[in-house]
Amino acid sequence: MSEPMSERERWQLELDKLQRGLQGDPFAFLGPQRDPGGEGGVLRAYLPGAQRVELLDEDGATLAELEQSDPGSGLFQRHLERLPPRYRLRVHWPDGVQESEDPYAFGPLLGELDLYLFAEGNHRQLASCLGAQLTRHEGVEGVRFAVWAPNAVRVSVVGDFNGWDGRRHPMRRRYPSGVWELFVPRLGEGELYKYELQGHDGLLPLKADPLALACETPPGTASKTCAALRHEWRDQDWLARRAERQGYAAPLSIYEVHAGSWRHRDGRPPHWSELAEELIPYVRQLGFTHIELMPVMEHPFGGSWGYQPLGLFAPTARYGTPEDFAAFVDACHQAGIGVILDWVPAHFPTDAHGLGRFDGTALYEYEHPFEGFHQDWDTYIYNLGRSEVHGFMLASALHWLRTYHVDGLRVDAVASMLYRDYSRKEGEWLPNRHGGRENLEAIDFLHHLNQVVASETPGALVIAEESTAWPGVSRPVAEGGLGFSHKWNMGWMHDSLAYIGEDPLHRRYHHHQLTFGLLYAFSEHFILPISHDEVVHGKHSLLDKMPGDRWQKFANLRLYLSFMWSHPGKKLLFMGCEFGQWREWNHDGELDWYLLRYPEHQGVQDLVAALNRLYRELPALHARDGEALGFEWLIGDDQANSVYAWLRHAAGEPSLLAVHNFTPVPRQGYRIGVPQGGDWDVLLNSDAQAFAGSGAGSQGRVSSESCGAHGQAQSLVLDLPPLGTLLLRPAG
C-alpha cells in the first residue's frame, strides 16, 4: 500500500499541472484554501514571471508578502492564521507593478437557472450570460468570462492583460453544463482576448469567443471586451407602427446593400456614420421601404461577403463599433426605413480560431462529414439537434432583433438546411431516423425560431432564401408550415432572367417563362429577388444581361424593372441595379457612381424612384400581393407579339392595368379590355423621355371604347412602346 502524499508532494503535483497547462480545477488549489475547521489557511497565487507578490487588505495596507515556493516556480503562497475576507495582490513584474483583486478569491458566477436554460437550449438572453460581460461582482469591477467547452481538460482566458499566457487565468468548470467561467477583476472595455483550450489530444489553437459582443478588426481574429449597448434609442414611433408597416398588405421594397462596397471614402470602405449620412437619404430619395444588409456579423474572410461568419453576436469591426451600428439602425428608423439583416444558421467556416472542433471534439458541428461538412462551401454544418447549439443560434437571432432593433432576418441557404442530401451524391449522406432525406433537427429549429421571433419581437420579418418546392415555407407552423414571413421567389427570378436574356425575336418561343410563375405566385408570401448572387461570377450585371445594342439594353432593363414592380410579390433589388451598372459587382471596390453623369443611367434611377412611388402609393400594387384576388390576367396568350397584360386589384381601390411589350416593335392601336369605362390615366410609360427613353407609346389620358375584349365590357386602344411597359388606372 503506497504512502499518502505529503502536503508538499500534493502542491508540487498541482504546481506541475499549472506549469503544464493541465489544471482543470484551479479553484481547488489557488486563492484562499481554508484549513479544515479553522479560520486560517493557505493563500496561493500562480504568477509565472513575477518577482514579488504582496498581500494587501481591501484598503491597500500591506498584510504580508507571499513567498515563492521554489525560485522561478511562479507559485507564491503563505499560510495565514486568519484568511482575509477581502484582499488584493500587489504583483511586482520586471517591467512594473500591478495591483488587483485575486480572480481565485471569488465564488461561482453563473446561476443555476442560467446554466439549466443554456443546457436546455432555451436561454433567450445568452448574449448577456456567456461570453465576456463587463460587470460588478462582489463589489469589484471587472469582466466575467464564460464559455461552453464540455470536453476540454482545461480552459484559460488569454489576452494582452496576461501576456497571452494560458497558465495565468485557468477557468472554473461548472458541472454538468460544461461551461467554464472566470471573473478577471479590474479588466475593462476594449481588451483583446481569446480562449486557450487543452483537449484530450493536446493543446488546441486559440479560439475566439463564440459569444463575443465585439471583435478585432480583420485580419485580426481576437475577441474584444465590450460593454452592453449604451445607445439611447429614438425609434419608438417606428417600432410602435412596425407590425403595420411590415404586414402582408403593406408595401415592401428592399434595397440590398453590401456595406463595404456601396460607396468608398478616400479609397476605404465607409463607416456606419458615413453610411447614415449618405445611404439613408439615397434610399429615401429612391423610395425603398427597407435596406437589407448582407451579413454584418463578424467574418474572417471579406471575400465571403459575410456569409461565412464566426461572430454571431458581434457586428463586424470593419465599419465601426457596435454603438455605431446601433446608431445607423436608429437613423434608418427615424427616416422611416426598415433594416433587414442576412443571417446564416446553416454553416460556418473552418478557420482555426473559430467554432470547428472547438474543444477538441465536434461541438457545434456534426461529427460525421456526411452530416457535418459542406463540400460546396468547405464549411462545417451546425448540429442543430444539439440543444446547446440550437439555443446558441436562437439567441443569436434574438440578439440582433432585440438588441439592435433590426426589423427582420433573411435566413441564408435554407434549402441546404432542409435536406440531408443537399448537393450530395448517393452514398454521401446519412438518412434521418425515419430513413428519409429531410433534416429533422434543422426543421425543428426553423419551427422554433419562427415561433419565438413572432412571439418575442412582434412584427419582425423572417425571410427564407429557399430554392426548392418545399411546401408551406411561409405558412404558420400551426398550419403545418415552416413559419417564415416570406420566401424568396427563386423560380420567378430564374425564369424571368432567362426570358429577358433572350433575343426579342425569340421570346415568342419562351412565352411560358413569364406566365408559369403566376401559377404558383400565391402559394407563398413571395419576395421577387434580384440579389447580389445574380450579378457576380460571370453572370453579368443586370444591364449587361439584356440583349441588343445600347438602346435596347436600357429599354429592356426599364421594361424588366417595370414588369417586376407590377408583378405580384414584394420587391428586392441589389445595389447598382437601380442605375444600370455595366460591370459585375466587386466587393473590394465601390459602385460605379460616375455612370449617373449619363442620361440613360440617370433615367433608370429615375424610373426606379417612380416605380417605388407608385408601388407605395397605390394599394392595388401591394395590398394583395399574396392573394389570387389581387391579380387578374387580361392577356397571357399573345405569344406572337410577346405582349402581356393584367389587372392588379385592392379592396375599395381603383384597379391598375399593366401592359408589357417585350419586343422592340411599337404596337399601334393595341386593344385591351378593361373593367371600367371612361378615361384612364397613364401613370407610367417606361419608354418616356423622362427616363431617357424614345418617348413612344401612349401618354397622358386615354378614353375607353364600348367594345368588349378579353372578357371585359370596355376596352382601351393603346400605343405600346417598344420594349416598354404602360401602367394605367381609371381617372379621377
Swiss-Prot record:
It comes from Pseudomonas aeruginosa (strain ATCC 15692 / DSM 22644 / CIP 104116 / JCM 14847 / LMG 12228 / 1C / PRS 101 / PAO1). This is 1,4-alpha-glucan branching enzyme GlgB. It catalyses: Transfers a segment of a (1->4)-alpha-D-glucan chain to a primary hydroxy group in a similar glucan chain. It comes from the Bacteria. The active site is at D412, E465. One of its GO terms (molecular function) is hydrolase activity, hydrolyzing O-glycosyl compounds. SMART domains: Aamy (SM00642). Catalyzes the formation of the alpha-1,6-glucosidic linkages in glycogen by scission of a 1,4-alpha-linked oligosaccharide from growing alpha-1,4-glucan chains and the subsequent attachment of the oligosaccharide to the alpha-1,6 position. One of its GO terms (biological process) is glycogen biosynthetic process. It is an enzyme of class 2 (transferase). Keywords: Carbohydrate metabolism, Glycogen biosynthesis, Glycogen metabolism, Glycosyltransferase, Transferase. Gene3D superfamilies: Glycosidases (3.20.20.80), Golgi alpha-mannosidase II (2.60.40.1180), Immunoglobulins (2.60.40.10). CDD domains: AmyAc_Glg_BE (cd11322), E_set_GBE_prok_N (cd02855). Monomer. Transmembrane segments: none annotated. InterPro entries: A-amylase/branching_C, Branching_enzy, GlgB, GlgB_N, GlgB_N_E_set_prok, Glyco_hydro_13_cat_dom, Glyco_hydro_13_N, Glyco_hydro_b. Its EC number is 2.4.1.18. The keyword Transferase applies. Belongs to the glycosyl hydrolase 13 family. GlgB subfamily. Pathway: Glycan biosynthesis; glycogen biosynthesis. One of its GO terms (cellular component) is cytosol.
